[in-house]
Amino acid sequence: MADRVVLAYSGGLDTSVAISWIGKETGKEVVAVAIDLGQGGEDMEVVRQRALDCGAVESVVVDARDEFADEYCLPTIQANALYMDRYPLVSAISRPLIVKHLVEAARAHGGTTVAHGCTGKGNDQVRFEVGFGSLAPDLDVIAPVRDYAWTREKAIAFAEENEIPINVSKKSPFSIDQNVWGRAVETGFLEDLWNAPTKDVYDYTQDPTVNWQAPDELIISFEAGRPVAIDGKPVSVLEAIQELNRRAGAQGVGRLDVVEDRLVGIKSREIYEAPGAMVLINAHQELEHVTQERELGRYKRQTEQRWSELVYDGLWFSPLKVALDTFIEKTQERVSGDIRLVLHGGAIIVNGRRSNESLYDFNLATYDEGDTFDQSYAKGFVQIHGLSSKVAAKRDLGL
């Protein structure tokens, strides 16, 4: 068997061009591996055939939709993970799964080298190569887009010169990454921060400012932090995401226009659509507010930010991230119950919570007669709680 390069293949411009380029420059055969992560309406058989048309000797499609939902999206839900408090890690959580399957394909197809189509400006180069280093440090890595400073214009020209089938032109230069968890759009006129996104940027969501539909009220049920039913109908994690993508997307929920801090030190503008992700994270977070003890909840919120940063920075397999996984999993033991919410006009409005694990005690919380909270405890508590501040104030004020 000839020496082979196993390429992470998306079906897009950069990786389609990379197949032909790698063959010409290295003389090695290219095996294209495309991972089905629920990429919207994209036909994976078309993607597989496109790789062969571009010159791959083999083209493999891996159906990883349930694996992605159960092992990557679910931990993101349970971590309430929003990088910079906004981005639900649409692309970031898919990269370690792609790395895993690329390594498996390299072992199965005689690959000694793995390749990706990432640029030198983005985060994905780090996510891929740190992942390869964690799972298969013996494999070589090549990154033609980065290492040879391809521009989109050069890539398009190369594709046209070599008759490579692509779905992009200089007039429509968006770079799009999508999976069942969400959709990311960048480049083109979006690079000017003052330019508003046009309607052709969006695909997963309807415009929340026009043609409003009737509000959609629904109930999401969780068991140990895992979504298990919608409106009483049992669902897998994948089915929950898909159903909420449909219903929330129809209400314009999940549109995000973000300027984010990339790992490589630059700021980047991204347009995200993540209707199902945003609904599930919001609902899960609300249920935690009901079921988690205060100090546990406070500490978990600190770990959520760090977990999000680690995943964004490509450290999915790092010891710290793995340790935080264990902590977060422990916190989910009593996160069970129902969250009722309304989707309308791009908004997520929680209006009901119930749980057998609830720490909300009506008799303690009520201000009506018959409450069981003994207010005689309050005066001494306030004095003790503020004592150190009071002592410091006397010193600072010279009293």
Swiss-Prot record:
Instruction: List the keywords (alphabetical).
Output: Amino-acid biosynthesis, Arginine biosynthesis, ATP-binding, Cytoplasm, Ligase, Nucleotide-binding
Q: What is its EC number?
A: 6.3.4.5
Pfam families the UniProt entry points to? Arginosuc_syn_C (PF20979), Arginosuc_synth (PF00764)
* InterPro entries xref list: Arginosuc_syn_C, Arginosuc_syn_N, Arginosuc_synth, Arginosuc_synth_CS, Arginosuc_synth_type_1_subfam, AS_cat/multimer_dom_body, Rossmann-like_a/b/a_fold
What does the entry list as the binding residues for L-citrulline? 87, 123, 127, 175, 260, 272
Instruction: Name the positions where L-aspartate binds.
Output: 119, 123-124
Indicate yes or no for the key word Amino-acid biosynthesis. yes
The reaction(s) catalysed by this protein are: L-citrulline + L-aspartate + ATP = 2-(N(omega)-L-arginino)succinate + AMP + diphosphate + H(+)
Q: Which GO terms describe its biological process?
A: argininosuccinate metabolic process; L-arginine biosynthetic process; urea cycle
Annotated signal sequence range: none
- Cellular localisation: Cytoplasm
Question: Sorted alphabetically, which PROSITE patterns does this protein's record hold?
Answer: ARGININOSUCCIN_SYN_1 (PS00564), ARGININOSUCCIN_SYN_2 (PS00565)
Which pathway does the record list?
Amino-acid biosynthesis; L-arginine biosynthesis; L-arginine from L-ornithine and carbamoyl phosphate: step 2/3
Q: How does it assemble?
A: Homotetramer.
Its protein name is: Argininosuccinate synthase
Organism whose genome encodes this protein: Rhodococcus opacus (strain B4)
* Taxonomic lineage of the native organism: Bacteria, Bacillati, Actinomycetota, Actinomycetes, Mycobacteriales
Protein encoded by which gene: argG
